[in-house]
A protein has these predicted regions:
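Sec-dependent bacterial lipoprotein signal peptides
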Residues: 1-21
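OB-fold and OB-like single-stranded nucleic-acid-recognition modules
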Residues: 13, 19-168
Length: 168
């Protein structure tokens, strides 16, 4: 559990600035799927686990806590896109802000192999294979991007949350 708290702390610290400033995709041009991405998604069919607003917090927390259980599975989710410098390397994330009893917590995942230029703060839909990566000796969950698009309209960047899995 201490490892999860440490990993979550690193991710939350990297994203905290954006939570304070706030984000929206109102000023961004949509970035559509490429033809290749569209073909790949069609081929995946029902093998994609779609994370909805209602199950976002529990699913992301579960993916972070037990990445090995989900490695190789395909997930799709929407959220705010950002990059942060971690150990001098620009690192991409998709996240949402969870609200519980007035307290806000950033909850998201690292994006790997993102080939498109997406502006910080854009609302994206990403489909990716769950993988793991070593970070300072800890196993972290990553989303190995298969397809990503920046959408014209943003969804809910803040979601109500029951606090289960909450880290202090």
């Amino acid at each position: 559990m201490l490892k999860l708290k440490r990993i979550t702390s690193v991710i939350c610290s990297a994203l905290l600035v954006l939570a304070i400033v706030g984000c929206s995709s109102d000023n961004f041009e949509p970035i559509p799927l490429t033809d290749d991405e569209t073909e790949i998604l069609a081929a995946m069919g029902d093998d994609v686990n779609v994370i909805t607003d209602d199950d976002y917090s529990h699913t992301i927390i579960e993916l972070q806590a037990h990445p090995g259980n989900y490695s190789g599975q395909v997930y799709q989710l929407e959220g705010v896109y950002t990059t942060e410098s971690i150990n001098g390397v620009d690192t991409s994330f998709v996240y949402r802000t969870l609200v519980h009893d007035g307290e806000k917590t950033i909850c998201g995942l690292h994006l790997k192999y993102l080939e498109k230029e997406i502006p910080d703060g854009a609302w994206i839909r990403v489909t990716a294979i769950i993988g793991t990566e070593d970070y300072d000796g800890e196993t972290c969950t990553v989303m190995e991007v298969v397809a990503v698009e920046a959408l014209a309209e943003a969804g809910q960047s803040q979601l109500e949350w029951d606090g289960v899995g909450h880290q202090h």
